[in-house]
Amino acid sequence: MNVNVINHPLVRHKLTLMREADCSTYKFRTLATELARLMAYEASRDFEIEKYLIDGWCGQIEGDRIKGKTLTVVPILRAGLGMLDGVLDLIPTAKISVVGLQRDEETLKPVSYFEKFVDSMDERPALIIDPMLATGGSMVATIDLLKAKGCKNIKALVLVAAPEGVKAVNDAHPDVTIYTAALDSHLNENGYIIPGLGDAGDKIFGTR
């Protein structure tokens, strides 16, 4: 499976705090931001670098910069917005694209009700953010939309993933790497990740 579980002590510690049943909205939201920041560091580890000259205090020197078009971060509405600030803290120049999905009542598959992409998607790396990767339907649909725009370099950043969701993404898009803080046990009969985080969107927005 093309999945990278970020097994860092700080990531594990903060994720456990999020799993607590009495985790407040403020605490959950803050931890989601902190985790997204830490995890984005790992997800950006293979960004391509190019050399260029700068004027330093002692004269001209050679330095490094990230090559190519700026990353676009793609939160899946609404829960993905809870991770956006953390990624932007690390990569403040990132461009933001947004995808909103809802379930078709007949096919039960996710369909887009809102999408807004930045320009030159075919030249940018994309980082999809969503707290939960459960069935994988929303993630697969979002990747479909990005590839339809010509995007070739796509990664997914999720706080918690279920094996079923990882398999769905890998089957549909084996070229996409998933970064997660935890690969949990399974989905229950209602489609919730076990042990998971509960309804991350409700907890982030205080609507539980």
UniProtKB/Swiss-Prot annotation:
Binds 1 Mg(2+) ion per subunit. The magnesium is bound as Mg-PRPP. 5-phospho-alpha-D-ribose 1-diphosphate binds at R78, R103, D130, P131, M132, L133, A134, T135, G136, G137, S138, D199. Allosterically activated by GTP. It catalyses: UMP + diphosphate = 5-phospho-alpha-D-ribose 1-diphosphate + uracil. GO terms for biological process: UMP salvage; uracil salvage. GO terms for molecular function: GTP binding; magnesium ion binding; uracil phosphoribosyltransferase activity. Its EC number is 2.4.2.9. Keywords: Allosteric enzyme, Glycosyltransferase, GTP-binding, Magnesium, Nucleotide-binding, Transferase. It comes from the Bacteria. Uracil binds at I193, G198, D199, A200. Pathway: Pyrimidine metabolism; UMP biosynthesis via salvage pathway; UMP from uracil: step 1/1. It holds the Pfam family UPRTase. InterPro entries: PRibTrfase_dom, PRTase-like, Upp_B, UPRTase/APRTase, Ura_phspho_trans. The keyword GTP-binding applies. Its cofactor is Mg(2+). Gene3D superfamilies: 3.40.50.2020. Catalyzes the conversion of uracil and 5-phospho-alpha-D-ribose 1-diphosphate (PRPP) to UMP and diphosphate. Belongs to the UPRTase family. This is Uracil phosphoribosyltransferase. It comes from Neisseria meningitidis serogroup A / serotype 4A (strain DSM 15465 / Z2491).
